[in-house]
């Protein structure tokens, strides 16, 4: 890609890295780390703005890209690196300040109103995916106010796909996460007294002929979801 970008300056090229902090990024980038500093318009002429401020020596790369093994290797101005990362995830590497300062970062809001299927109903219930997740996330934050990792346990807008709202998939994917992770220390915060184990939750949810969520959630939690559903319906009617 570096060679293509170098030879085609009229077009933009993007290297996309998913979950950047899943690995030891500085170690993975190696000497390329130095190329992340780009020339600023306040300090360099227009024709140089955007390219790497500092070059590195790499004979093999230089020969392939420039045809000259002694040519300093730089990222051209028409090549950008885009990366995603979950700063709340506990099972990742911490990125040091020196590495992070070389990036322009943007916080992505976990807004269920932007989810394509937030208004889709969870199979066998009277509750939509967006309403369910919003109520649960509020409870996760409230019950983990003294824990830095509470955001890590929240449901993201892409946590469950539309097909995973089906009864046989929802319990195994979403309810399992709530039992095993989000409310691991005290599942009774959201699950009713008849659910003594995850097996009970899955079994009752999948076999219930009534509202499936009502069969496993605490009454006050379920009613909170119904109330939010009612409020959203009123808001939609007013629009």
Annotate each language-model stretch with its function.
Residues 1-239:
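C-terminal regulatory/interaction module of P-loop NTP-utilizing enzymes
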């Amino acid at each position: 890609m570096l060679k293509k970008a170098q030879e085609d300056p009229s077009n933009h090229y993007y290297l996309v890295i998913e979950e950047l902090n899943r690995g030891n990024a500085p170690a993975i980038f190696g000497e390329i780390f130095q190329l992340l500093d780009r020339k600023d318009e306040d300090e360099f002429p227009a024709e140089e703005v955007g390219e790497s401020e500092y070059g590195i020596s790499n004979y093999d790369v230089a020969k392939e890209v420039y045809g000259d093994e002694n040519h300093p290797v730089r990222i051209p101005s028409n090549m950008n690196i885009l990366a995603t990362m979950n700063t709340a995830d506990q099972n990742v590497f911490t990125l040091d300040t020196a590495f992070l300062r070389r990036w322009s970062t943007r916080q992505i809001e976990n807004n269920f109103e932007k989810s394509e299927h937030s208004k889709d109903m969870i199979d066998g219930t009277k509750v939509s995916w967006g309403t369910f997740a919003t109520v649960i996330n509020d409870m996760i934050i409230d019950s983990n106010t003294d824990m830095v990792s509470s955001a890590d346990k929240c449901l993201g807008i892409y946590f469950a796909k539309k097909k995973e709202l089906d009864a046989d998939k929802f319990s195994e994917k979403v309810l399992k996460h709530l039992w095993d992770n989000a409310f691991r220390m005290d599942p009774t915060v959201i699950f009713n007294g008849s659910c003594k184990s995850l097996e009970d939750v899955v079994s009752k949810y999948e076999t219930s002929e009534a509202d499936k969520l009502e069969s496993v959630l605490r009454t006050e939690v379920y009613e909170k979801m119904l109330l939010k559903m009612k409020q959203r319906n009123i808001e939609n009617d007013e629009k």
